Amino acid sequence: MQLSKLAFTSTETTGFDGIVRKFTDIYMAVFKMEKNLTKEEIIEYYVNNPCMGGNIYGVQQASHYYFGKDVKDLNLVEAAQIAGMFQSPNGYNPYINPNDANERKNTVLYLMKRHGYITDTQYQAGIKVAIKDLLKGGTTSVNEYQGFIDTVVQEIIDNTGNNPYDVPMDIYTTMVKSKQDIINKFYKSYNFKNFKDKGKELEVGIGVINNKTGAIIAVGAGRNKTGAMTLNVATFSGQVKRMPGSTAKPILDYGPAFEYANLSTYGPFIDDKTPYGGGNMRNFSGGYSGFMTMRDCLRKSINTCALQAFRLTTNEQKKEFAAKLGVEFSEETLPDSYAIGAFNGVSPVQLASAYSAFGNNGKRSTPHSYTKIIYRETEEEVKPVIVTEQVMKPQTAYLIANVLTSATSSSVHVSGTSIATKTGTTSYDTTQLRKFGLTSSVIPDSWTSSFTSDYAMAIWLGYTDGLTKETVKKKHYLLNGTATSERIKIQAWLGNKIYEKNAKFKHPGGISSAKVELETIPAQSPSDFTPSKLQGTFLFIGNTGPSETSQRFAKLTDPQDLSYNINNKSLTLSWTSPGTPSAIDTDYLTNWFKSNWKIQTDKYLKKRISYNKKNIGEFGFAIYLTQGTSSTYVGWTKDTSYTIDMNNYSGLYDGAIIKSMYSIFKSNASSGRKVVFTIGEADITANDVTINVSNQNVTLSVGGTYNELNKSSISSINYKGNDIKGDVSSLSVTNSSITDGSGENVAPSKVTEKAGTYKAIYSVSFTYKGVNIAKNVTQTITVE
């Protein structure tokens, strides 16, 4: 009946199915097997069918695998070892669990003595022999694909309750050999030279998911794998999973905020003291940066901003969003610590599956390592249940991908492919660190989770045995700086080989791009004069972008009610002020910061006032005297009147312009208001000016074409040694007369009809500093 149980029926032991299985065992044993097989054949079938550890089946294979000999050549101790493995072949595998295997061997020897099969002398001699000393070579050869096999086996057990090592079946896996071979090569060849003992005990768990199907295409189940069904660091199956650190931020913080709160890549957030757990949230850097955009918050992994984003959505919204990504919580209320990934936990495969939705326009499929199994005895085909669903809006997925693309190291590069990356680091409790005399630079986990539009890959770096006296003594722990540097190298090593070329994230529509003036809350468009360093372009869901233009640097309002008074050489100008602009008005700013900044209001109000004093200055007015279209700057004042001593200015002026203007930041000065008057005396006459033309003497042929002078013919206008051509206005050139050698007038069109010398006189007129000037220039024309 034991044989029928192992070979032909299910493993169910409880309930109605258990009763059915028991009667089936009896039926198979009594009516089928014992009628058709001899007892010797039954025993032979029994010992040559079961799994004996890993991929070893039957006692003959086991004899060669463990002891390098045929089963008929085994000694008493070796035979006792194999006999004891039937109950738990992997648990009593001497390569994997030598101590448990030795105890099991001793139990078998004791039972053999008790039932009279061996003597006490044989028993005493047998228990003194350590089974590890009898093993072939003392080590095991592990199938290079064992990690993926283990992943598949565990999933089948979880899904069906049947162990492929016990129940014969054909399994169709999702493994892509070329991708798995890359990870296998990484395990064999990567040099962990920056770690103690070259990282001998260091583990790297890896999970790679096909975004569109959910298929697990490759895993890194462990660098130090010693056999089948040992610790799998790709899935942490049956183990406590690891804290994800900041890789949780897209899942619990920013993803839900995009989905439910219409967060944009602008945000914004205030990186400063944020109440948390009876104190304040701390950043890894130990400092704060103040105003930050959402893009920078996630890209730089700022904890305070993550906590603020976490609080933008309800508890139910966060739990629902995470659950759809395969990260479920039993807690009714998620504590604030989860905002920075301080929870147990996730595995690389689980994290890669969650991130696959970000690369697939918000769609996620159930992660799976096999597509179907066929039971050999019944030929029954069973497929895993795979659900594909839209777990978030396509816009949410795209925004996360867009932001995280800018967080990818330049060393990770695949031609034509956009790669998005989020890293994560966890920390030990300070009490635990103090216990072993360690600093906060010692960390338990270092993560990299990245994705393209095709694949998602999560990498975990760490030690599996935690902090103990032994591990601390051997320095088997991560140092944050080393781990951070190494994870970038590992991501590049793997990503540059696993990711395919020309994979771009698909823009889903429903997203608008808009320029924003930084430090505006809510987002406002920059004005024409906003400094470029205070501008940025960001993405918004739908039409939630800026609807107003910021007035902080907007063009100032002109003064009103201009008047003047002339007293001899004294000119007094007066006007009405439009009022202090809100951008530098302390009362306005106080109310604005209280209403919008929320965090550390007084601190950032003072910072803004200080910025204004250094970069904008005081509000006042600039005064200019005008001469036609040209103007001369006179001075600046905070007052609403200004007196000019005209003895200091030469020339004739036709008015003045008053502009609202800051004392330092002048770009956004108002257009200005003009008051008209006449003051001063002209200090320029035609006699003071010399006009030069480029073709003052010209030679033409009879029958040729004569071109009259025009404005472009004027090469320079000299006044007091300076060329003032660029400063004049209303420049014009007109023909006065053309005469031949006898003094007769000649029309311009007749000049080249016969040979001779001609004199052309042109009148050049212009306005300079309010004075109108007219002067003749002469051109000599020779016709041959």
Predicted regions and their residues:
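Peptidoglycan glycan-strand catalytic modules in the bacterial/periplasmic cell-wall system
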Residues: 1-118, 224-227, 301, 311-312
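Conserved catalytic neighborhood of penicillin-recognizing serine enzymes
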Residues: 1-13, 139-141, 263-318, 335, ...
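Active-site SXXK
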Residues: 42, 112, 183, 214, ...
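Short, well-structured active-site flanking segments
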Residues: 57-60, 120-122, 258-277, 315-320, ...
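Non-catalytic structural connector segments
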Residues: 119-173, 179-202
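A penicillin-recognizing enzyme superfamily signal
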Residues: 173-196, 208, 219-221, 227-240, ...
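Soluble, non-transmembrane domains of envelope/secretory-pathway proteins that act on or interact
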Residues: 423-710
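Serine/threonine-rich, repeat-prone extracellular segments and beta-strand-based repeat modules
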Residues: 722-768, 773-779
